[in-house]
A protein has these predicted regions:
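Nucleotide-activated chemistry modules centered on ATP-dependent adenylation/adenylyltransferase
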Residues: 1-273
Length: 273
């Protein structure tokens, strides 16, 4: 079993093109959709309208996976956050003291979902699957920073090809594909300031929804006698932290493109599983 963990953004789509061109030896790509109500709508549109047709035209399997509950129903990150009576905070919210919270979203909705798929298709400790992750050369410090499960062997083919993130637009354009948006949940607390500013300016309805989610989380926290949490690093409600007309000062590299999200918090979380 040999699969590429596809995240929907720059590196993943560059890898898809390289595979179609015979430069990357992967013919099965797995996209973990963490929820139609959770993924950025622009990412879902790109995957369905561009990536999947391109993959099919070049004999590549691009499977869309979702997390299922024991009763067979689909579970989403947004659904877990907003479920009646839920105390779960699977996303890395900022605590009231500024510290990042722990999270389980990547492990539960991506790593375990891909793990289940490869095991269903024959992966085991005796015959582990090769799972490729789209980390580019400029992100080499992110490679090998999570525990490898017995049923898998992690691979970083973009490193072998010495592909940098800045190379991805040219690779994608060479296939006649438009540039994909940066991939992440629309409410992800790892968004940098620029992403929130762009959302408020370009997609105000989505920004308002993020503010509403923050309100819901804090209403529940208040009922439980707990401190507030925030979706940004500014220690105040999103609608106050991001003002209308605010300028983007620095390039925003916030994304969840490698198919998995990797941060120090995730490394610690993985070793607690």
């Amino acid at each position: 079993v040999k699969v590429f963990a596809y995240g929907g953004g720059w590196q993943s789509n560059a890898a898809l093109v390289l595979a179609a061109q015979g430069k990357l030896d992967y013919r099965t790509f797995l996209f973990c959709n963490v929820g139609d109500d959770s993924e950025d709508p622009a990412t879902l549109a790109y995957v369905h309208d561009h990536a999947m047709p391109y993959a099919a035209a070049h004999g590549i399997e691009l499977h869309e996976l979702q997390r299922h509950k024991r009763d067979g129903s689909v579970e989403t990150i947004f659904g877990r956050l907003t479920r009646e009576g839920s105390r779960s905070l699977p996303i890395p919210v900022r605590m009231s003291n500024g510290a990042p919270g722990t999270r389980s979203c990547t492990a539960d909705f991506k790593i375990k979902v891909i793990g289940k798929w490869v095991k269903q298709h024959g992966a085991s400790a005796a015959s582990p699957a090769t799972i490729a992750i789209g980390i580019s050369l400029d992100e080499i410090d992110r490679a090998n920073n999570r525990r490898q499960e017995p049923y898998e062997r992690l691979d970083y083919p973009l490193l072998d090809l010495r592909v940098r993130r800045s190379d991805c637009p040219g690779i994608i354009a060479s296939a006649g594909l438009p540039m994909p948006p940066k991939s992440a949940c629309w409410f992800c607390p790892l968004h940098r300031e620029g992403a929130w500013i762009d959302m408020r300016r370009e997609r105000p309805t989505l920004f308002t929804a993020a503010c509403g989610l923050e309100d819901v989380l804090n209403f529940r926290r208040r009922e439980l006698g707990k401190d507030k949490v925030y979706l940004s690093r500014f220690g105040k409600p999103l609608r106050e932290a991001i003002s209308e007309g605010q300028a983007v000062l620095f390039e925003d590299e916030s994304h969840c493109d490698s198919g998995y999200c990797f941060t120090v918090a995730l490394v610690l979380e993985q070793h607690r599983l």
